[in-house]
């Protein structure tokens, strides 16, 4: 074993690596080329592309609110467009990241003595995800506020609103040395403690979307005291041990060797160039690009989300995260287990799993009430695996025709999701959990 190289890429990976490198560097060359074109020439092409798009592809027009939300630069402008205000709060984690919390308020309503709801977004997104809608009635935070709740939106380390550390700067590699482990050990518990101190409450209600579900489950599983601070945990479209990608080529590359991502993108921020393409692309064309990408990767049809909603939502969908956090998810996908980050993943190939075992998040240890809402067409959840890892008291509701993003932006989200969420919050905060479960027949 003296010649074993921990950072080695095996010969079977080379074809995939070369193809991936070609794709990455082709994008880089295209970006540099477009950037070098004079602004006046770029604008000339942009105008003609818009004309051709509306002539040959679509002549549909958008409504005023869609245009307004799409053009908003941040969550403050989005909420203002709907008549709400945003309080900004900063949380210093135990490992010295500065996280930004957004508390959504209504100017005509008091926050005093309201039940607290803490909502957390998914991977490579931010708090805007919850409010980037063209109708206020289809934003869960807005609906919760009107239902009498004190709503807080969290942000992961490294994203648009949380790019601050006491020691490191975003240009430093050390800044991006974080994975799901760090969010579970620090971000979620420290954010919960801050909200409870600020509001004077003993408990809050937690709602997570996608990775926001996974990282809170991880946090609850390794922080026993955290369970005593949560009335109910509600997971929307949980990302939990996904089976993989729908595209065979992509699935093969990431499953053969997740560390390929480090060779492609380094150990820093992942895909910051998305913001460049988003800025130069005509929004309906950007929507088409995102739709095609999600179809290729996850086989989502996205037919339950309107074009106007996509124009609003996709404009605020992407935010920064670390390459390491994505590598962590690729490890989870490869092993089909909800595990901690594997720092020595190459050892599995060198020594075999008989002598090396990555710790799993002990999610069976979660004590607080749990409700999982998942979609029958969501390829990012493996319910067979998830059920074996949930505690016996966890309840689930399935929506057969739902894909991943439908839980945020689906056209029928007001009828399919919001009533279940609000009923769960109401009954658990009133201590009527048993009646709630029996009445709704959860399975």
Swiss-Prot record:
<dbReference type="GO" id="GO:0016125">
    <property type="term" value="P:sterol metabolic process"/>
</dbReference>
<feature type="topological domain" description="Cytoplasmic">
    <location>
        <begin position="1"/>
        <end position="16"/>
    </location>
</feature>
<feature type="active site" description="Nucleophile">
    <location>
        <position position="210"/>
    </location>
</feature>
<comment type="function">
    <text>Probable lipase.</text>
</comment>
<dbReference type="InterPro" id="IPR029058">
    <property type="entry name" value="AB_hydrolase_fold"/>
</dbReference>
<keyword id="KW-0472">Membrane</keyword>
<feature type="active site" description="Charge relay system">
    <location>
        <position position="404"/>
    </location>
</feature>
<dbReference type="GO" id="GO:0004771">
    <property type="term" value="F:sterol ester esterase activity"/>
</dbReference>
<keyword id="KW-0812">Transmembrane</keyword>
<feature type="glycosylation site" description="N-linked (GlcNAc...) asparagine">
    <location>
        <position position="304"/>
    </location>
</feature>
<dbReference type="InterPro" id="IPR025483">
    <property type="entry name" value="Lipase_euk"/>
</dbReference>
<dbReference type="Pfam" id="PF04083">
    <property type="entry name" value="Abhydro_lipase"/>
</dbReference>
<keyword id="KW-0735">Signal-anchor</keyword>
<comment type="similarity">
    <text>Belongs to the AB hydrolase superfamily. Lipase family.</text>
</comment>
<feature type="glycosylation site" description="N-linked (GlcNAc...) asparagine">
    <location>
        <position position="177"/>
    </location>
</feature>
<feature type="transmembrane region" description="Helical; Signal-anchor for type II membrane protein">
    <location>
        <begin position="17"/>
        <end position="37"/>
    </location>
</feature>
<keyword id="KW-0963">Cytoplasm</keyword>
<keyword id="KW-1133">Transmembrane helix</keyword>
<dbReference type="GO" id="GO:0016020">
    <property type="term" value="C:membrane"/>
</dbReference>
<keyword id="KW-0443">Lipid metabolism</keyword>
<dbReference type="GO" id="GO:0005737">
    <property type="term" value="C:cytoplasm"/>
</dbReference>
<dbReference type="InterPro" id="IPR006693">
    <property type="entry name" value="AB_hydrolase_lipase"/>
</dbReference>
<feature type="glycosylation site" description="N-linked (GlcNAc...) asparagine">
    <location>
        <position position="134"/>
    </location>
</feature>
<protein>
    <recommendedName>
        <fullName>Probable lipase C16A3.12c</fullName>
        <ecNumber>3.1.1.-</ecNumber>
    </recommendedName>
</protein>
<keyword id="KW-0926">Vacuole</keyword>
<keyword id="KW-0325">Glycoprotein</keyword>
<feature type="domain" description="AB hydrolase-1">
    <location>
        <begin position="116"/>
        <end position="410"/>
    </location>
</feature>
<feature type="glycosylation site" description="N-linked (GlcNAc...) asparagine">
    <location>
        <position position="335"/>
    </location>
</feature>
<dbReference type="GO" id="GO:0000324">
    <property type="term" value="C:fungal-type vacuole"/>
</dbReference>
<keyword id="KW-0378">Hydrolase</keyword>
<dbReference type="GO" id="GO:0008204">
    <property type="term" value="P:ergosterol metabolic process"/>
</dbReference>
<feature type="active site" description="Charge relay system">
    <location>
        <position position="378"/>
    </location>
</feature>
<feature type="topological domain" description="Lumenal">
    <location>
        <begin position="38"/>
        <end position="443"/>
    </location>
</feature>
<keyword id="KW-0442">Lipid degradation</keyword>
<dbReference type="GO" id="GO:0016042">
    <property type="term" value="P:lipid catabolic process"/>
</dbReference>
